[in-house]
Amino acid sequence: MWKLNKSKVLIEDSPDEEIQAQQDAQIKDQLLQEEVQSPVSQLATKELQSLKTSFSSMKGQVTVQGASFRGWKEVTSIFNKDDEQQLLKGAKSKVISAKPKEDLKTEKKAGFWDSLAIKQNIQPKKADEIEGWEPPHITVEESPTFPDDGLDDPNSWPGWEDETKGSTKYTNLTSSGNSSRWSIKSAGKLVSIRRRSKGNLTENWKELE
């Protein structure tokens, strides 16, 4: 009896549980639809769509790049290795030709400043150290020898004292006799002065040497 009643009760209760489960599923579906209709969900769907489109475009680009790479291979197959080396040499030569200009500028600057420093440090050379320089040869001319006529000695002139005694303190130079004597006397004095001056010059030159 108990078993039969229990089975009846379970059979009677089962349709109600099924109805509740169906209702719960419907409620969940409605909630999901509302979430999909919300702006956040719309943004998410847009992002998913954009990702799909970008992925498809990337596939297209990969195919295009592959085609361009094949075209580049075809173009490079036209040229030989020698042509490639010549092209590379031309580019290298341009780079090398650009570098020496900068090097020349730096060298010029360094040379200019170095030359100034060298000029300041170099001491002026003496005349003896200069190559090819020789001291001037000074030849001492012999002084002319004059015969001693006794012009310097006033006592050798006859009648000189007699004429001066009768005159005043100073003799008269305007007279004809005295003028000739004075000219002879002065000539003798000049010769002696020249001899003395030449002797002084030779002594000075010897001291300098």
Curated annotation (Swiss-Prot):
Disordered: annotated segments: 126-183
Pfam families xref list: TDRP
Keyword annotations from UniProtKB, A to Z: Cytoplasm, Nucleus
GO biological process per UniProt: spermatogenesis
An example Gene Ontology CC term for this record: cytoplasm
Keyword Transcription regulation: no
Family of this protein: Belongs to the TDRP family.
This protein's name: Testis development-related protein
Species this protein is from: Xenopus laevis (African clawed frog)
